[in-house]
């Protein structure tokens, strides 16, 4: 009988099964009960255990949710999940930042999601406008929370494929690893530059592309307020990181951030901020919409 068969037979015995279950519970308790948020209230139980368990088991390990069970590694998704665990352990965030750098194209855009396959990773190249910025955000969060600046100098290869053509909104592919590697900091610069170089619309806001965090807004073809906010917030922090590392370029990036932030502030509609603008200049999410 194979080793797996012997293990299966042993676990069919109730005593053995219950003993292994308790071992698994004990291991998970050690992993997730690290915050020590005070109080015997439901919120404390959620934060101290279940939120961490869900992030680790469901999001990072299982890569699934109640509405999405494809098992792919999402560029923005797993960066957000891993950064949320920084108070528990910095390891997932560090690992995810490096992995996402390895799924960035030479042009600065990134794979929206991918499946890790034995013969090479397969995924989609898109025109989503926010994906690459999450790498910059995650790097700033990681360095700020851990003080580990060494990650900024780690060298990581890019991936390479033909850029999307004019009529292509996305492409499923297996890109090749390029011969070019740069520091994580330069990967972050490439991400900011890629987003900025796509330009702004008539209101000075960054362009939606094929979705700016809200993937359902893939046919707007206009300008995004949220995206411009996120760019301003993230790039301002990136400029601060450059100063901390004694690197050049902080003034340039601070000016880019200020320009986007100012344009986004002008999107105030009297009661709330607009969501964006269609390509013809019509507002999205106005208080005057029916």
Predicted regions and their residues:
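Acidic/polar, glycine-enriched structural segments that form the non-catalytic walls/loops
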Residues: 1-72, 162-178, 241-243, 248-255, ...
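Structured mid-domain segments that build the active-site/substrate or prosthetic-cofactor binding neighborhood
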Residues: 1-4, 211, 219, 233
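Short, glycine/acidic-rich hinge or "gate" loops at secondary-structure transitions
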Residues: 5-10, 149-158, 246-253, 271-277
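Aromatic-rich carbohydrate-recognition surfaces in CAZymes
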Residues: 17, 82-93, 97-202, 225-232
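Active-site-adjacent bridging/hinge elements
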Residues: 49-63, 103-115, 199-214, 271-283
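Solvent-exposed loop and edge beta-strand segments that line ligand/cofactor-binding
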Residues: 64-78, 120-130, 215-228, 280-290
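Residue-level signal for short amphipathic helical patches enriched in basic/charged
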Residues: 76, 88, 146, 245-248
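Catalytic cores of carbohydrate-active enzymes
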Residues: 111-112, 230-290
């Amino acid at each position: 009988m194979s080793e797996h068969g012997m293990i299966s037979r042993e676990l069919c015995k109730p005593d053995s099964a219950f003993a292994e279950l308790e071992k698994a519970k004990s291991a998970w308790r050690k992993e997730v009960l690290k915050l020590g948020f005070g109080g015997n209230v439901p919120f404390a139980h959620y934060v101290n255990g279940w939120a961490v368990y869900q992030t680790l088991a469901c999001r990072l390990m299982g890569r699934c949710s109640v509405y999405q069970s494809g098992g792919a590694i999402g560029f923005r998704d797993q960066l957000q999940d891993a950064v949320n665990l920084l108070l528990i352990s910095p390891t997932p965030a560090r690992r995810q930042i490096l992995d996402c750098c390895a799924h960035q194209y030479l042009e600065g855009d990134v794979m929206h999601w991918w499946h890790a396959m034995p013969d090479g990773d397969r995924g989609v190249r898109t025109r989503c406008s926010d994906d690459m910025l999450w790498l910059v955000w995650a790097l700033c969060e990681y360095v700020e929370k851990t003080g580990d600046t060494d990650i900024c100098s780690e060298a990581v290869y890019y991936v390479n494929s033909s850029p999307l053509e004019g009529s292509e909104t996305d492409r499923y592919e297996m890109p090749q690893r390029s011969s070019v590697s740069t520091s994580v900091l330069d990967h972050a610069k490439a991400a900011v530059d890629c987003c900025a170089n796509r330009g702004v619309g008539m209101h000075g806001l960054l362009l939606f592309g094929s979705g700016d965090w809200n993937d359902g807004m893939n046919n707007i073809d206009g300008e995004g307020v949220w995206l411009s906010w996120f760019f301003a917030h993230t790039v301002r922090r990136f400029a601060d990181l450059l100063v901390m590392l004694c690197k050049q370029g902080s003034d340039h990036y601070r000016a880019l951030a200020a320009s986007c932030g100012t344009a986004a502030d002008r999107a105030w509609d009297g009661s709330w901020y607009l969501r964006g603008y269609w390509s013809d200049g019509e507002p999205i999410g106005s208080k005057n919409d029916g």
